Regions:
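Residues embedded in well-ordered secondary-structure elements
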Residues: 68-70, 135
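Generic secondary-structure microfeatures
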Residues: 54-59, 79-87, 110
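Acidic-leaning, charged glycine-interspersed low-complexity segments
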Residues: 19-28, 46-55, 96-154
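Oligomerization/assembly interface segments of phage tail-like spikes and tubes
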Residues: 71-88, 139-152
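Conserved aromatic-histidine-acidic binding/catalytic patches
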Residues: 1, 5, 94, 134
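Small/polar-rich, solvent-exposed N-terminal microdomains that initiate assembly or binding
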Residues: 1-68, 118, 157-162
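Short, solvent-exposed secondary-structure capping/transition elements
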Residues: 62-64, 89-95, 155
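Extracellular/virion structural assembly segments
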Residues: 8, 70-76, 84-108
Length: 162
């Protein structure tokens, strides 16, 4: 069974984040997961280096006008990458340093191929925000926003048209 272009893009993001490993020269090992149900991350194994890939609702873009072509539809697909980062109480490295390394590794890896395997027009880096779970002082991290712009045929979301 084939997948729509947006699913291929999402799978590429997960694969790229999963490829961030110390053995390959990165600062840490990251493990990307996608929730199996909307609004329920409760069953995810919360661990240091976990990156939860949240696919948000897409927006229309004006990229269709650039092509002057009818029959195409351009989308801006936002993703929130929720990265868990924590350390032991006796650690001496500032938590900001660890968070900065996670963010930089993810941004660098995702920008190696802005086209998400040829399925997208471009990948745009957005802002980020650090977080702490008030109920669990050890649960800290950063949320990174990216947006992937892609184009498909108006009548066929399985066919890319870049």
């Amino acid at each position: 069974m084939s997948n729509p272009v947006v699913e291929l893009i999402t799978q590429d993001i997960v694969e790229k984040i999963d490829a961030i490993k110390v053995a390959d020269g990165w600062n840490q090992d990251l493990n990307a997961v996608r929730p199996t149900r909307l609004g329920n991350d409760e069953n995810l194994p919360i661990d240091n280096g976990l990156v939860i890939v949240h696919q948000e609702d897409p927006d229309d873009t004006d990229l269709d006008a650039d092509r002057g072509s009818q029959g195409l539809k351009a989308w801006a697909q936002p993703y929130l990458l929720e990265c868990i980062v924590w350390q032991d109480d006796d650690a001496t490295t500032p938590i900001d340093t660890l968070i900065n390394r996670v963010r930089a590794d993810i941004e660098k890896k995702l920008m190696e191929d802005e086209s998400r395997g040829g399925n997208a027009i471009e990948t745009l880096l957005g802002g980020s925000m650090k977080f702490t779970d008030e109920g669990d002082a050890e649960l800290t991290g950063i949320i990174i926003l990216i947006t992937v712009q892609y184009r498909v045929r108006l009548t066929d979301p399985y066919t890319k048209s870049n």
